[in-house]
C-alpha cells in the first residue's frame, strides 16, 4: 500500500504508546494522554482496557475512584462504570463513557482514539423509540432519576410501547442537588435530559400532574383533576420526604 494513502479509518485515528506492559499490575489504573485526550487505562483480570477518564455525572476524575473487578466507582457520588464497555451500571449519572482500542505489543501498551471523538466525554446507550401501533402502556409515577432511568432502560432493552412519566413538578426530571450549590440557575442547566431527547425516544413527560389514587384491579390511576389514566404496567417512584418530629420542652430539665 502507498505510504501516502492510508485507509480512511486509519487517517481518522490517533494511536500512541502510553506505557510499558509491566507498568500496571492487575487491579490498577492510571491516567494517560493520547494526543491532548486524557484516557483512563485499566488493568483488570489480566487484560488492559481504556475508557473516558471523567465520570459522566459531575466530571470527577475516575483515577481517584475504586476499581473492583471490571467496575470502577466514582470518588464523588459512587456512580459505577464497566471498564470493558464503558457502560454505566449504577446511578447517579445517566450516560456511559467512551471506550478506546488497546493493543499490547512487544511489551508496550498502545491506545487508539478517533480524532473526531477527542472532545467526547460521555455517550448515550443505544435506544429504540415508540411504535405507535403498540398500545401497551407503562406508567411511571414520579419525575425523579429513578423514573427516568426506568424509562431509558426500557428503551435500551427494545421496549417499543408507550411510556408515560407523570410528575407534579413544573419541570421534567432535573438535577436537584444542583439547587443547593448555586443561586439563579438557568433552567436548561439543571435538566437531566432535554425536550428533544424525550421526543426522539418517545417518552411522554406529563408535568404538573398529580396521581391521587391507584386502582390495581382495573389498572387505572386517578389524577387530582378527576381524570383517569389506564396502564398495563406501573412503577411508583415518587421518592420520600422528610417528616419532622417536634418535641416540646415542658421544663428546663426536659430535652428537645
Specify the residue positions occupied by each region the protein language model found.
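Short cysteine clusters
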Residues: 55, 74-77
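Hydrophobic structural packing positions in well-ordered secondary structure
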Residues: 24, 55, 102, 151-154, ...
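Iron-sulfur (Fe-S) cluster-binding segments and ferredoxin-like electron-carrier domains
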Residues: 61-69, 80-92
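Short boundary motifs at domain starts and secondary-structure transition points
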Residues: 6-9, 127-132, 154
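FAD-binding core/adjacent interface of flavoenzyme oxidoreductases
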Residues: 75, 84-108, 112-139, 191-256
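Short amphipathic alpha-helical segments
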Residues: 67, 86, 151-153, 177-178, ...
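Beta1-alpha1 glycine-rich phosphate/pyrophosphate-binding loop at the start
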Residues: 133-204
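N-terminal pre-ligand scaffold of iron-sulfur
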Residues: 1-69, 103-114
Amino acid at each position: 500500500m502507498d505510504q501516502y494513502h492510508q485507509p480512511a479509518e486509519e487517517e481518522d485515528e490517533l494511536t500512541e504508546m502510553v506505557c510499558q506492559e509491566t507498568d500496571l499490575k492487575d487491579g490498577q489504573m492510571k491516567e494517560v494522554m493520547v494526543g491532548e485526550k486524557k484516557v483512563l487505562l485499566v488493568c483488570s483480570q489480566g487484560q488492559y482496557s481504556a475508557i473516558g477518564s471523567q465520570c459522566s455525572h459531575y466530571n470527577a476524575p475516575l483515577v481517584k475512584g475504586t476499581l473492583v473487578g471490571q467496575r470502577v466507582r466514582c470518588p464523588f457520588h459512587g456512580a459505577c462504570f464497566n471498564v470493558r464497555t464503558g457502560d454505566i451500571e449504577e446511578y447517579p449519572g445517566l450516560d456511559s463513557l467512551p471506550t478506546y482500542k488497546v493493543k499490547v505489543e512487544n511489551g508496550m501498551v498502545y491506545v487508539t482514539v478517533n480524532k473526531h471523538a477527542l472532545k467526547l466525554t460521555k455517550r448515550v446507550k443505544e435506544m429504540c423509540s415508540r411504535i405507535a401501533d403498540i398500545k401497551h402502556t407503562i406508567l411511571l409515577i414520579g419525575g425523579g432519576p429513578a423514573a427516568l432511568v426506568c424509562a431509558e432502560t426500557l428503551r435500551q432493552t427494545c421496549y417499543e410501547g408507550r411510556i408515560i412519566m407523570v410528575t407534579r413538578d413544573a419541570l421534567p426530571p432535573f438535577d436537584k442537588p444542583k439547587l443547593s450549590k448555586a443561586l439563579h440557575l438557568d433552567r436548561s442547566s439543571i435538566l437531566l435530559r432535554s425536550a428533544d431527547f424525550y421526543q426522539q425516544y418517545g417518552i411522554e413527560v406529563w408535568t404538573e400532574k398529580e396521581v391521587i389514587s391507584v386502582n390495581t384491579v382495573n389498572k387505572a390511576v386517578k389524577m387530582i383533576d378527576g381524570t383517569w389514566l389506564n396502564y398495563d404496567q406501573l412503577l411508583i417512584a415518587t421518592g420520600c420526604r422528610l417528616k419532622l418530629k417536634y418535641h416540646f420542652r415542658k421544663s428546663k430539665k426536659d430535652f428537645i
